[in-house]
Amino acid sequence: VLRAELTREEVADPLPALTGNTLVSLEVLHEACAATRERGCAAEVEESAPGVRCVAAVVPCRLPGTDAISCSMPVDQTTDAQARETGEPLAEATTDLAHRLRRAGIR
């Protein structure tokens, strides 16, 4: 999710493959970053660890973002729809956190 905060030029190489689902194509990574920016959250299935899906959102208090919150869920206990439904409230929570941090003078 933090890579989606960067420009296309700043995302010069994909992350090392951790599983068979890790995005290793730079073009696919750029497409995923664009989709993340459009949705306001990132979603992945078994890209980082087998059996785990994750939804994440940037805490929008720095440019580019340096902080994020994620929710990891077991693949065999979570549907695609449930994972999608997690993204919106997660993005709302990170936005709320950013506002609270600013009011407290932390960011």
Give the location of each predicted region:
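Short alpha-helical scaffold segments that flank and stabilize functional sites
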Residues: A57-V59, D96-L97
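Juxtadomain coupling helices with adjacent low-complexity linkers
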Residues: P50, D67-R107
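Short, solvent-exposed recognition segments
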Residues: V1-S48
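Short hydrophobic/glycine-rich mini-motifs in sensory/regulatory modules
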Residues: V59-I69
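Short, electropositive, low-hydrophobicity segments enriched in small/polar residues
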Residues: E44, V55, P74
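A short beta-strand signature within small-molecule sensing/ligand-binding domains used
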Residues: P50-V58
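Arginine residue identity/basic-tract feature
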Residues: R3, R8, C33, R37-R39, ...
